[in-house]
């Protein structure tokens, strides 16, 4: 068979771009923390990962609102927050009647024409804003926040009466009054962890210790109490002054009467022209509680009110009551404009209020002048306001109903091109859609449809065209229909009586019915989750200082209520910006880019001559993985699909956790690699010449810059040495088989890219020639990079072919969920050179065959359950099909585990990453019950729950690079099943191991708290050591063996119970424990000296069988030699009555 050299497959790992940043004062909202500036977020993160003069990266682990690749908003953990020095231009992007955000020029925004850099935005562009921002819904987190706020020096708290007797021993001498009068400061409560026992509170300065408050207010506990308090807070923010409420509405008064549940009375007082509502019985305590929890201002309320953090940390059921109180007091319904409006002297308050309303999906508008006005308009927003907040004031509630009826439109969605694409895909002419949606034609060109209209359009399109067969016949020329021909000409399907390329493509799509409801789902998700607001102004300014950003898996997050994005080495090689055209996907998926050798020669220029000998490779095939996690998908027969890898390391940041993980994976797969030390342009004073070879560029640098580069390179070389690699700058490497080559580059400006390409090509040819020789005519073998829905094609697979030739009429065998899928290729689609499989700028080229190495998209029936990372084998006979099925099944079965035994549940995004994670767990001795590919489902959680009942530490789900389904999250929260997700394998396992350790310590602490330890004591024989004979008896004792604690029962030699130790005193101090050798006084409740106990008598701590079992099995390490002696002595006593104790 003919053999030839194929192009090498190059994987690019570890690129992280820190160039896209925001000003320090831009705000994000953390569900568990509320609004916080990026600088504040950075200060919150304490563990520094990397730091130098230019930047600092810290571990974060906080949750943020992001947009997933399906267009839906969700909460995701952000692993890092960082700051970088910036000197130069910044842009403030201001959205019309919304917020503004200041970013570096390269920071992208999601617009209706895809992701667009800030410096390419223009007024009138529509930018994405989230419809919803997630706040906290956990009652537990809310209550802990309240307790934190109550740590106030003026707090005086009264505890529940039944607790006082239990804690009296803690308050002796001059502190006994606290228990007697039931008055405690926050330090007392914190020390004894009594927050849950606080019943009533008041506030008085410490300097007035002699004074005491007249009235306390009940600390809210029940939903009813919190709702009454939050409504009152809302009214105060609207109509309140320092001690009264100016409000005429009787309904507000009726609502405020509900404060009686907190022990506060209200009365309505008629003044000359209006009514006032006054608080009595606990007014001062209630107002002070308001100031503490809601940061309510003491003076100049109008200008100084701000939205307090509690409104983002409290569950929505309480926040809605605050908002109702506020809008009842200050809101106005304008029937003329069909809108709700509220005006304030505090612009900042209303700006934050607009973000708070996003917790309910309400998108408002902000009009700024001397006073700021917030407006809620549009049918969808008004309807959500009515559903979640509403008015108690009758005339406002009635006006709202009328405003909703009058309001017919919600936000507009200017997605003209998408609508045309969907219409043609489903086989409609403009005229046909006009009958479903009047004046439809204008929505494709001049007028953006409202949300309601868009939903009607999508519903109509989704039903499909009833005359599709006739249209197919017209395009095929079998039928002549003048109206259709005219419509097709207008849509560009026919020109001069012939089918255009678009017409031919569409005909194929219609014939095969290659469209379904999933084609409209993405647009529907965008409309449900996002709103697009026009850019009003872009202001340019100079800035010197730190800029900030956070890392998320999806490379986007919400800042100042606006969606912002972080994205790429390959962009420079392609001379095209991927982020600019990612309108639909948002996250960067695995892509493949073919670089013909002519392009390499053009970019590398004269450097080729330095490489002695001709480069025979046809080109390079780059696989651009968004991180180490995707590399695990590139598996082929247990090894790596990649022939060579480029590990991108930021020369300024050095090694990151991802870098270490990437190196470990490369080592595991035995993949040769070279290092691209990126961002040399960030070295102070570096002279930049775009696309210049590094060896030319370095000659233009001054000595200081060269020295800094050398220092950073030596730091990298040292790190590689620690990991077992000899590394050096590429031009100093003597033997490429023994030394790791480091190429200093600037991906941003193209410096060093020529050397990188020459090195990749030269090393591949010199050292991998035998591996790259393929049988051209042999059946193809490949690996699935990604399974994805394509408009007009259905489910497709993006595949890297690494051996043989794949033909368009081949039968292929593909790895599926738990089976081998056999299917016939319907279409082979290959991107043009210098483009990406996943998102080509131009339409795919249909090809008859592809020869390795190549990236190809395969359209074929039955691919819905295909697995990323699994093999693809072409088979040309029944025998080959059977052989391929067996090979694929054995590969899947070697990775997918289902033992049914006690062990953890493991889920991963691809077969390769599942293999890597499972291997790591097994090496650490962590048993696996089930390992499978896919998101974490409710079934996974239920299976982990069944494990938890037998062995709690294994009753967990570990997920690598996967999402948690909503129902799975609900069940996990309800049943207490821990779910660990992450995108760094070793970090995921570390987190799990840390949890196991913490759980074991927690369990041990719980056992220690509840178990009774053995102890043997002897009363002193001298009567002088009998301090009281009864109620309680107080006697001096010596601990002979073991230990004693308050609360234990004592027994005699006969086994008879004599009483309970109430307290233990060692000299002048009450203690919680006395051990062997201690001489102490003990108070025994229930015993009388001379009747039940006698001087010189030996007594034993009474133990239950359960105590012994726990001590022997679970707390063996906690037992000292003296405890074991005491246990044996006690067992001897108890064995007289029960034979169980003889075995102890």
From Swiss-Prot:
UniProt xrefs under Gene3D superfamilies: Hedgehog/Intein (Hint) domain, Homing endonucleases, P-loop containing nucleotide triphosphate hydrolases, Translation factors, Translation initiation factor IF- 2, domain 3
Keywords associated with the record: Autocatalytic cleavage, Endonuclease, GTP-binding, Hydrolase, Initiation factor, Intron homing, Nuclease, Nucleotide-binding, Protein biosynthesis, Protein splicing
Record's keyword annotation contains Hydrolase: yes
GO terms under biological process: intein-mediated protein splicing; intron homing; translational initiation
Annotated PROSITE patterns: G_TR_2, INTEIN_C_TER, INTEIN_ENDONUCLEASE, INTEIN_N_TER
GO molecular function terms attached to this record: endonuclease activity; GTP binding; GTPase activity; translation initiation factor activity
GO cellular component: cytoplasm
Keyword GTP-binding carried by entry: yes
tr-type G domain boundaries: 551-768
PTM note: This protein undergoes a protein self splicing that involves a post-translational excision of the intervening region (intein) followed by peptide ligation.
The DOD-type homing endonuclease domain, residue ranges: 232-362
Positions with a binding annotation for GTP: 624-628, 678-681
More details: The intein interrupts the GTP-binding site.
Function: Function in general translation initiation by promoting the binding of the formylmethionine-tRNA to ribosomes. Seems to function along with eIF-2.
Listed NCBIfam families: aIF-2, intein_Cterm, intein_Nterm, PRK04004.1, PRK14845.1, small_GTP
Family of this protein: Belongs to the TRAFAC class translation factor GTPase superfamily. Classic translation factor GTPase family. IF-2 subfamily.
Protein's UniProt name: Probable translation initiation factor IF-2
